[in-house]
Amino acid sequence: MNGLIIGMDLCDSCTHISCQGQETIWSVPTRIGKEPDSDVWRVAEESAGGALEGMVVEDKLLSLAMKDGTATIDGVRYEGLYLLKMFLKQVLAIPRQASGKEEIENLVITVPKLEVKLVDCLMYCADFLEIDRSRVHVISHAESFVYYVMSQKREVWSNQVGMFELSENGLHYYELRVQRGLRQMQVVADQEELEESFHLNVLDSEAGIQMADRILSSCAERLLQKRLFSAIILTGRGFAQTDWAADFMQQICKRRRVFAEMDVFTRGALIRSEDLCEAQSAYHFTCICEGRLKTTVSLKIQEREKEGQLVLASAGDSCCLLYTSDAAD
């Protein structure tokens, strides 16, 4: 098969798409418009201003689908799941048109918070789009962060790696550490939504900028302390420019490698998508993060007077795959 290999960062505010062989990362506001008195649905890329002029527009499609909500558009009531299906259909048309390919070989979707119901919704979307479920994988932001970092040079992840995300979704902190064992290396990633979060519109005023810089500096002092980090990453729209956060930058740059990457999650999703297409993974580690089991689950058994362990699920197995397997049974 020589189809499209895609990584997608799907959030309530904006969706980012990357595709193997394409340098462009497409950004599309997570909203859909319908032309009046027709069955034509459209999305608009941010590069085109994200405008859907003359259309009835519905946004926050993930939240709408998750709460089984509905929206009335042009006098017709639509389920949130249906609107999400139409949105993904339009979004996937972008890399299809750019590459001239229709078939999707593998699609990895990364989401801010991994929930069983959301995975179900996205699998229903795959059915609607006639993409085999075996080619669709849903992972957490933490897991895409892991694959992005582990694809870098060893010097980047030789010690702990911290990442601050400042976006429309709020302020989040991620931390990765590598645990080397006798059998296999474990990569553990934690994520935290910070209580000190603020909306990006506070950066529109000088007073708001000063407040945001103080908040970030306080968070960095509490989270990083004097620990050794091989890298600190900044991601999200709020860090598109960093000169406004002078005190924060000064603090995190002390004896640390710091770099900004706006598309960590979609790049990580694409890396994971590419790896899943290989006969053997290039990443020889057990990933422990949101959406993955932290410990091995086993039963103590006795067979012919000998005791042993029956492993039901291993550390690093996908929780969503386990759920899907149970549901199928």
Listing of model-derived features with the role each one plays in the protein:
Residues 1-3, 133-163, 264-286:
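Conserved phosphate-binding catalytic cores of ATP/NTP-utilizing and phosphoryl-transfer enzymes
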Residues 2-26, 151-187:
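Gly/Thr-rich phosphate-binding beta-strand-loop-beta motif of the actin/hexokinase/Hsp70
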Residues 14-110, 115, 188-225, 229:
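Conserved phosphate-binding loops in N-terminal lobes of ATP-dependent enzymes
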Residues 82-150, 262:
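Active-site neighborhood for divalent-cation/phosphate handling
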Residues 107-119, 220-251, 257, 261-262:
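Glycine-rich phosphate-binding loops at beta-strand->alpha-helix junctions
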Residues 145-150, 156, 173-212:
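Short, flexible helix-coil linker/hinge segments at the edges of structured domains or between repeats
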Residues 163-178, 280-310:
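Extended, charge-rich low-complexity interaction segments
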Residues 323-329:
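Conserved small/polar residues in nucleotide/adenosyl-binding loops
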